[in-house]
Design a protein with these regions (language model features):
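Boundary at the C-terminal end of the N-terminal hydrophobic targeting segment
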Residues: 21-25, 29
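Short, solvent-exposed mixed-charge patches
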Residues: 135-137
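Bacterial N-terminal signal peptides
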Residues: 9-18
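Bacterial N-terminal signal peptides that target proteins for export
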Residues: 1-10
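Charged, solvent-exposed structural "stalk/scaffold" segments
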Residues: 28-68, 81-120, 124-126
């Protein structure tokens, strides 16, 4: 008898909260869309400034990483999350290569290389975690 009461109470609670979850969805979707637009504009602005020589490549990587991470985090499918993470890995690889080149010319140090290596490894770790079970390994 207690089990029936518990299940009934759970069912009622679920019915009470479900409409509020659906009501949040359009608001959340609007926020997600607006944030994607803002982050995209930031990337475009930083790239423009980089082309003009008024900012460095770190600013470009940071802006792109923010956009890609956001898109990964709000993606609704595992495949889309993985696609965004693959782009993050590619971005981190380019960043590491550029920092290594600067270190070779003496304009960067070994700590910067280590930090960029860590960022790449963290991105690859996340990519591995997002892989479907059958493709891990």
């Amino acid at each position: 008898m207690n089990l029936k009461k518990s299940l009934f109470s759970f069912g009622i609670a679920l019915l009470m909260f479900t409409p509020s979850l659906r009501a949040e969805t359009p608001a959340r979707a609007a926020i997600v869309k607006e944030r994607d637009t803002v982050l995209s504009k930031i990337v475009a602005d930083v790239e423009s400034r980089y082309s003009a020589g008024t900012t460095d490549d770190e600013a470009v990587w940071t802006a792109k990483l923010s956009l890609l991470s956001f898109r990964r985090d709000v993606a609704t499918t595992a495949g889309e999350k993985l696609k965004q993470q693959e782009q993050i890995v590619a971005l981190q690889e380019k960043r590491l290569n550029a920092i290594k080149e600067r270190a070779n010319t003496g304009t960067s140090d070994s700590l910067a290389v280590l930090r960029a290596t860590d960022a790449l490894l963290a991105a690859k770790q996340m990519q591995a975690e997002l892989q479907p079970e059958g493709k891990k390994g």
